[in-house]
């Protein structure tokens, strides 16, 4: 991916982060998932008092996209920080999100974990989830 594309996706993730509902952890996460068709879907984390129904930003973006008919993706940007603080660390997807993303992005999905538009790590889902289990395993 070109630097301008990476930065644009990071900006979308920051825009999504503003809508996070995090009254328990106070850690807000934003994600921007790009379909292979170029369409971008934003997601934020949404917490729940009973914790189990809590949904991560990455899966929020993924579920929005799939529910609108998009099922192939090439990149996701993720940002996260404590509420009221600037992003001081990179936030990677949790294990559940890695598995959910693997279903639709496979090991080649580009994963951008960012502190800012200029400070970020670019890797692949295959690096974050080696030997991932996907649809091909069931054929």
Segments the model singles out, each with a brief description of its role:
Residues 28-35, 112:
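Short beta-strand scaffold segments in enzyme catalytic cores
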Residues 13, 31-32, 61, 65:
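Small-residue (primarily alanine) positions within well-ordered alpha-helices
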Residues 25-26, 55:
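Short glycine/proline-enriched turns and hinge-like loops at secondary-structure junctions
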Residues 1-8, 139:
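Basic/polar N-terminal segments that are highly enriched at the extreme N-terminus
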Residues 7-22:
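Short, basic/aromatic recognition patches
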Residues 20-25, 109:
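Extended beta-strand/beta-hairpin segments
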Residues 42-137:
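Zn2+-dependent cytidine deaminase-like catalytic core
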């Amino acid at each position: 991916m070109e630097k301008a594309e990476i930065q644009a996706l990071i900006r979308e993730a920051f825009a999504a982060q503003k809508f996070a509902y995090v009254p328990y952890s106070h850690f807000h996460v934003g994600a921007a998932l790009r379909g292979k068709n170029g369409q971008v879907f934003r997601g934020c984390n949404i917490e729940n008092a009973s914790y189990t129904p809590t949904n991560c930003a990455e899966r929020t973006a993924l579920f929005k996209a799939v529910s609108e008919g998009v099922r192939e993706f090439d990149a996701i940007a993720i940002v996260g920080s404590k509420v009221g603080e600037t992003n001081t660390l990179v936030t990677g997807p949790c294990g559940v999100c890695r598995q959910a993303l693997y279903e639709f992005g496979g090991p080649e999905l580009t994963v951008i974990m960012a502190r800012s538009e200029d400070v970020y790590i670019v890797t692949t889902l295959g690096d974050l989830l080696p030997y991932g289990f996907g649809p091909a395993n069931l054929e």
